[in-house]
Amino acid sequence: MALTIGIVGLPNAGKSTLFNALTKNNVLAANYPFATIEPNVGVVAVPDERLDKLAEVFGSAKVLSATVEFVDIAGIVAGASKGEGLGNKFLSHIREASAICQVTRVFRDEDVTHVDGEVNPASDIGTIQTEMILADLQTVEKAIPRLEKETRGNKAIVANLEAAKEALAALEAGTPVIATKIDLELVRELSLLTAKPYIYVFNCDADELGDESLKNEMRALVAPAEAIFLDAKFESELVELGDDDEARAMLAEMGVTEPGLDVLARVGFDTLGLQTYLTAGPKEARAWTIRKGATAPEAAGVIHTDFQKGFIKAEIVSYDDLIAAGSMNDAKSAGKVRMEGKEYVMADGDVVEFRFNL
């Protein structure tokens, strides 16, 4: 699915280091502003332990995870909305993203310069939010006269005009559009930056990762958005190990149970409004990506459009019921497998076999 998460942040916040670790790519990560100019795109697997279990049950030869796409975008600076730094390029790239992941520097390292001369997470978050709001103000101010003209001949878009005016008022008050009650569908065509869902990644050092008071302070700063805490440099070192046992030992030493990258991939997937259903057989156990709220025929169409066109029924068992039963035959004997029709809304973790007529 063509949905992406744009990784943004001030220069030297750790964006490219995080992206390198996420995608296991060696993207340029340098200690100077704008080391990234053109956005780098990486497809990241979403960790899902259910696939390994399914592979055991069905004797699958391989597993295929769902994926989420991250884009590493040039560092933003104050004045970006006026074209400062690489502002115009930054804003055009982030406008294309479906959600935003802001990397905020918490770690202190004299060898890594800060664009403003001091580490201040609240100030950094405020800088980027201000630039996004200013950019959206420009967009909405241009859109309203156009919408006013268009409504004279098309009353169907009056609601869009009113939503744009509400957005203008919110932005002038310094409020991101996503924090309002505006129907986002009515302003979707404007591609407003502050209407996108947000994830905040706080790039910490080892001591800060164990400081619950600091983490709670950061969570409160960005609530209700998701806050993830990790050490991008450490995560990069974990990836370089290539040894799961050694990686687990390093994580245990840090006092964490799983890599921050795994958390980010899952949270990113969820933030995009996505979920998975599962299929399994001797060839592969696979997670398929669908939007939350997708119907069974729509889910079938992800495999092949012909499956959606010729959809008849879906044979479904929940993952938990299947694993508890031990096999598909035992799940059927226990009455846990059911047939669902065209109106069925898929649940995350449904194990499915589609029946269709070509």
Q: Where do the PLM segments sit?
A:
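Conserved protein kinase catalytic core
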Residues: 26-27, 78, 111, 209, ...
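Conserved G1/Walker A P-loop phosphate-binding module
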Residues: 1-84, 88-109
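Short, flexible surface segments
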Residues: 96, 347-348
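Conserved Switch II/interswitch segment of TRAFAC-class P-loop GTPases
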Residues: 42-47, 74-84, 95-157, 170-182, ...
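Short, intrinsically disordered, mixed-charge
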Residues: 24, 56, 92, 130, ...
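Amphipathic alpha-helical transducer elements in NTP-driven molecular machines
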Residues: 34, 48-51, 64-70, 84-97, ...
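Protein kinase-like catalytic core scaffold
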Residues: 69-72, 99-102, 200, 228, ...
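C-terminal-of-GTPase-core extension/linker across diverse P-loop GTPases
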Residues: 2-8, 13, 19, 146-345, ...
